[in-house]
Amino acid sequence: MKIPPFVLASASPARRRLLETVGIEPIVRASDFDESQIQLSEPAELVKTLAQCKAETVAPQFESALIMGCDSVLSMNGEIHGKPADTSEAIARWQIMQGNFGDLYTGHALIDLEQNRTIVKSQVTRVYFAQMSDRAILAYVATGEPLKCAGAFAIEGFGSFFVEKIEGCHSNVIGLSLPLLRHILAELGYDVTDFWQ
């Protein structure tokens, strides 16, 4: 089977770096899909739908490729949180998150243009947050990192200091579950090692 190019339909530097770390050099094509069009209350369905819409938006740019779309949200106390709109929202969220836990959902959509197949799945990881002082919350938000991330934290950045533990897939919290990607590729007839560079 011919190995197609791997396209990441995401502007997320964390997802790109994660793939590069494990030997996959993706072609990056950020999706311009308007996420506000999708309003779903169930986090797993929301992230799967958004991931698929992102991948489908990028797919027409290619004739033969694997197009990977992803989307992440943090579900906490029955509410769904994407990226905070501003510093005030990030501070308010961290005042609730600190000392608490939430479930980080990431939707994964992989379109195989050659086989005309799409596989869409989600992964969830429980994240336990540390107790934090107001000073620590303000300092963390001042780094700007929480404004760029679903759930207002990055486990691979400054936010790692404030994550006590996780239950589930670590790479999922970064924004792309590597074990789930391996399973999806296998379902399409590929071995993940085919994409190593």
UniProtKB/Swiss-Prot annotation:
Q: Which cofactor does it need?
A: a divalent metal cation
Membrane-spanning intervals of the chain: none
- Keyword Cell inner membrane (UniProt): no
- Give, as one word, the top-level EC class: hydrolase
Please give one Gene Ontology molecular function term for this protein.
nucleoside triphosphate diphosphatase activity
Tree of life domain? Bacteria
Q: Which UniProt keywords apply?
A: Cytoplasm, Hydrolase, Nucleotide metabolism
Q: Which SUPFAM superfamilies match?
A: ITPase-like (SSF52972)
Provide the reaction this enzyme catalyses. Answer: a ribonucleoside 5'-triphosphate + H2O = a ribonucleoside 5'-phosphate + diphosphate + H(+); a 2'-deoxyribonucleoside 5'-triphosphate + H2O = a 2'-deoxyribonucleoside 5'-phosphate + diphosphate + H(+)
Q: Extract the InterPro entries matched here.
A: ITPase-like_fam, Maf-like
What is known about what this protein does? Answer: Nucleoside triphosphate pyrophosphatase. May have a dual role in cell division arrest and in preventing the incorporation of modified nucleotides into cellular nucleic acids.
What is stated as this protein's family in its record? Belongs to the Maf family.
Name assigned to this protein: Nucleoside triphosphate pyrophosphatase
Q: Where does this protein come from, organism-wise?
A: Nostoc punctiforme (strain ATCC 29133 / PCC 73102)
